[in-house]
Design a protein with these regions (language model features):
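N-terminal secretory signal peptides
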Residues: 10-69
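Short acidic/polar inter-strand loop motif in beta-rich domains
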Residues: 145-150
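Extracellular beta-sheet/turn segments enriched in Thr/Pro/Gly and aliphatic residues
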Residues: 64-66, 71-78, 156-168
């Protein structure tokens, strides 16, 4: 069985991995935007609804709380190939459509537009969005002539990684 991780302060962990001084939101945004080839192979960063959990290849672990009012969701629309995922891994998750332009609209159940615009997927094939916590609504993604719509939610039991949106 795996040994229990060595839990350490986030500052100590971040400094050792070249992320010194970054907030939890900065860690997420930095790793998400990093070209795949430059991502640290010895670092796992798992985005949970309320924290980001960092683990390295020496079994050190740190966690950083996320803002109380925000929920990070990373979305990888796809045409033909995807993977199952629930908590987004900033260093290992890969989506099919890397560096592609997509239109995304997210509308809350009450009709409020939470996000709308043209986004470019990161090198890992994902678009990461900060949304209000505890909402439910609909996400629509369009890429070229293909579109997909699906429910989306940002509660404590909801996924931070959405890989089920097939463009048709």
């Amino acid at each position: 069985a795996d040994a229990s991780p060595n839990i350490e302060p986030a500052d100590t962990f971040l400094e050792r991995h070249g992320l010194a001084g970054l907030s939890a939101t900065d860690v997420i945004e930095t790793l998400e935007a990093m070209p795949v080839a430059e991502r640290p192979a010895n670092l796992l960063a798992s985005v949970r609804p309320d924290e980001v959990v960092l683990t390295d290849d020496e079994n050190n672990q740190a966690s950083m709380p996320l803002p109380d009012d925000q929920f990070y969701v990373s979305i990888a629309p796809y045409a033909s190939q995807t993977h199952d995922c629930f908590f987004h891994s900033l260093t290992t998750c890969r989506g099919e459509l890397a560096n592609e332009s997509v239109q995304i609209t997210i509308t809350a159940a009450d009709g409020t537009e939470l996000a709308a615009g043209t986004y470019t997927t990161n090198d890992n094939g994902f678009v990461g969005l900060w949304l209000p916590r505890d909402i439910a609504g609909t996400i629509t993604i369009t890429a070229g002539e293909r579109t997909v719509s699906a429910p989306i939610a940002t509660g404590v039991d909801d996924p931070t990684c959405i890989t089920t949106l097939q463009l048709t």
